[in-house]
Amino acid sequence: MKWIAKKRLQSVLGLSVVDGQLRVAHVARAKSAIAVVRSASAKLSLDLLHPEAELVGREIKNHLEAAGIRERNCVIALPPSWIMTQHAKLPELSAEDQASLLQIEAEKGFPVDPDELQIARSPHRSSESAYVTQLAVRRDQLTRLSTVLKAAGLKPE
């Protein structure tokens, strides 16, 4: 059986929205380096979580067109206000028990049910103990963001 290899992108659009300010940078491979092809910044009149995702997507698309940016493959930095964090000390436990402990910590530490969150974990050690940092974002926000990006004609990677 022959596997189809995913082609490496030669360029990508990076986006961030913080406090209603859209910032974009189109970057591309240039020999042995990465170069910024074009960048732009614009104030959004609509919030990313506006009920009509198509309108938000259209506004982003209009800003990209005005800046002369045609790249559609993108990555996006999540708005910092969407990210919840939690830091926990991990006792010596089996992997299964650690997963259960982190689930309990998430239930106690985050303001919503962990089933409504996308949680990423980053383990780290000090000389004395093991710790984990849990980062969480509401799934409904991620779904809305995906809908907005698709409405803007973008392809999140």
Predicted segments, located by residue:
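Hydrophobic/aromatic-enriched cytosolic interaction surfaces used to assemble or bind macromolecules
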Residues: M1-E157
